[in-house]
Amino acid sequence: MLRLDPRDDRGSILPLIAGFGALALAVVLLGSAATSLYLERTRLFTLADGAALAAAESFDLSTVRPTPEGVLRPRLTKPEVTAAAADYLTQAPGSRLEGLRLVSATTPDGLSARVTLASVWAPPVVSIFVPEGIPLQVTATSRSVFD
């Protein structure tokens, strides 16, 4: 039987350390990118939610009419909803997102406002791999209640 001499250990663990270091760095960068993407989407959704709420409350009091059951219901129009959403976005403190735009602001039933916003997300560290960024789009709906 052939036995290896224990004093004949040659080699280096440097490639192993470099490989694990690169793997750890990749995990950290991917984790920070995923967190950044989540926070950017949350900011965009918060803006869309606020714009939808402002648009849902943009009705004129002269348009409020009682239903046959005696409940007061406001009537929203598309121009009012669009103007209120755009006005909210110009005044909102978090509206400095890159490439923020109002895609649509509509009222599907005359009682609720639906706002769709779009933005562009760029990774915080490795943006060289995605120079144009990644497009994000969110939609929020808010209903006006007149009680």
Predicted features along the sequence, with ranges:
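Short secondary-structure boundary micro-motifs
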Residues: 12-13, 19-21, 27-28, 87-89, ...
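Short secondary-structure transition/capping segments
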Residues: 6-13, 101-107, 141-147
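Short amphipathic secondary-structure patches
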Residues: 54-116
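Generic short beta-strand segments
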Residues: 117-123
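Low-complexity, S/T/G/P-rich flexible repeat/linker segments used as non-globular hinges
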Residues: 123-147
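Alpha-helical assembly-interface signal, strongest on the long, hydrophobic N-terminal helix that forms
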Residues: 1-81
